[in-house]
A protein has these predicted regions:
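Patatin-like phospholipase
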Residues: 1-229
Length: 229
């Protein structure tokens, strides 16, 4: 409930304060990113209160990407805030985060659903909660940040399919069905409450029908689109 309430309060400007001036400024100054993560950092800090991995009640591992090597980097100790900012540093949108001599960006660049990392850490059963994709969108996003997010969403669905196919013989993998059809852009925060309601209702029904215990075929949300003529 606390997490849902946090999401309901968020507006796009709280996370992506993108304006015409910020885009022009990035070009004039030759920056490699459009937005400073100041507001995102404030949200994380006010929510986590300077939490450290070592003090958490449950083990947590955050995956980022080394921007120079392209390899996934699993962060499991130290400051959670820095790890999350690194893991969500969408290339071009946010700057890379420097940590222990490495430049880190969004984990989705190397592995959006880090099944491989979970297997390497010893997981025997993996439950994937995919964010889904805007499969009913009628036209592509018109600004750079929204387009970057949309493309990464497409990539994550493809990679999820490959990862499940590769690792399902080694560990038990369950993919919770995402919302479909979905027309909202990942850059659109105006529909958050409605999406939370739909997702909760659908997931409760899925759990009630034995979704977690089902031995049937895995539900993998492949990249797709609902075409309208």
């Amino acid at each position: 409930d606390r997490l849902a309430e946090l999401w309901r309060r968020l507006r796009r400007k709280d996370v992506f304060p993108l304006t015409l001036w910020s885009g022009i400024k990035a070009l004039l100054l030759g920056r490699d990113h459009l937005i400073e993560p100041t507001r995102l950092r404030r949200i994380v800090r006010n929510t986590l209160h300077h939490a450290r991995f070592e003090d958490l009640p449950l083990p947590l591992h955050v995956v980022a990407t080394n921007v120079l090597s392209g390899q996934a980097v699993v962060l499991s100790e130290g400051d959670v805030e820095t790890a999350l900012l690194a893991s969500t540093a969408i290339p071009v949108v946010f700057p890379a985060v420097q940590l222990d001599g490495r430049y880190l960006v969004d984990g989705g660049v190397s592995t959006n659903t880090p099944i491989a990392s979970a297997v390497e850490l010893g997981a025997q059963r993996i439950i994937v909660l995919p964010t889904g994709m805007s499969c009913a969108m009628l036209e592509p996003p018109r600004n750079m940040a929204a387009l970057a997010l949309h493309v990464m969403g497409l990539q994550s669905m493809r990679q999820l399919d490959r990862d499940v196919a590769h690792y399902s013989s080694q560990v038990h993998i369950t993919v919770v069905p995402p919302l479909c059809p979905l027309s909202a852009s990942v850059f659109d925060f105006s529909q958050t409450a409605a999406l939370i309601y739909r997702a909760a209702k659908q997931t409760y029904e899925w759990l009630g029908s034995g979704g977690l215990d089902s031995s049937g075929p895995l539900h993998v949300p492949l990249a797709h689109h609902h075409y309208r003529r």
